[in-house]
């Protein structure tokens, strides 16, 4: 009996406060984010174009439909979360893609988060103005 290929591949991406759940299915390259088309959802955000870098690096652009749900954060963080989610999902399609994506940093989770505000300060590090007299 032949091994069945799964018809859906899943990857999770996170960046700042944004979390993206990416589902890849074989198709003609249609990308839907939260029920809207990719271009409509990001409306010309230049950083959003980089979210699809994983498809370009692996030569799989146009071979998969992506259904993405993304929550939290702003447009930039969401775009980066989608980029990581797509890269992780593509790894499940073919583990050999790691050699193409790893040098480009597509599989690296950016650990930078917002630093918390401390009491006695105006922001995380900004102290109140100092007066000598």
Swiss-Prot record:
Entry GO CC: cytosolic small ribosomal subunit
Xref: Pfam families: Ribosomal_S9 (PF00380)
InterPro entries listed in its UniProt record: Ribosomal_Su5_D2-typ_SF (IPR020568), Ribosomal_uS9 (IPR000754), Ribosomal_uS9_bac/plastid (IPR023035), Ribosomal_uS9_CS (IPR020574), Ribsml_uS5_D2-typ_fold_subgr (IPR014721)
Keyword terms of this UniProt record: Ribonucleoprotein, Ribosomal protein
Sequence ranges of Basic residues compositional bias: 119-133
Any one GO molecular function term: structural constituent of ribosome
Biased composition (Basic and acidic residues): 107-118
Region (Disordered): 101-133
Domain of life: Bacteria
Disulphide bonds in the chain: none
GO annotation terms (biological process): translation
PANTHER family: RIBOSOMAL PROTEIN S9, SMALL RIBOSOMAL SUBUNIT PROTEIN US9M
Family recorded in the similarity comment: Belongs to the universal ribosomal protein uS9 family.
Protein name: Small ribosomal subunit protein uS9
Organism: Deinococcus radiodurans (strain ATCC 13939 / DSM 20539 / JCM 16871 / CCUG 27074 / LMG 4051 / NBRC 15346 / NCIMB 9279 / VKM B-1422 / R1)
């Amino acid at each position: 009996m032949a091994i069945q290929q799964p018809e859906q591949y899943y990857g999770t991406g996170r960046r700042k406060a944004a979390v993206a759940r990416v589902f890849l299915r074989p198709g003609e390259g249609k990308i839907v984010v939260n029920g809207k088309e990719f271009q409509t959802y990001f409306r010309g955000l230049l950083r959003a174009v980089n979210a699809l870098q994983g498809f370009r690096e692996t030569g799989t652009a146009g071979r998969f439909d992506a259904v993405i749900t993304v929550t939290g954060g702003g447009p930039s963080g969401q775009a980066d979360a989608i980029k990581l989610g797509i890269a992780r999902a593509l790894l499940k399609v073919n583990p050999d893609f790691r050699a193409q994506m790893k040098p480009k940093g597509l599989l690296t989770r950016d650990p930078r988060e917002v630093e918390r505000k401390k009491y006695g300060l105006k922001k995380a590090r900004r102290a109140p103005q100092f007066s000598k007299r």
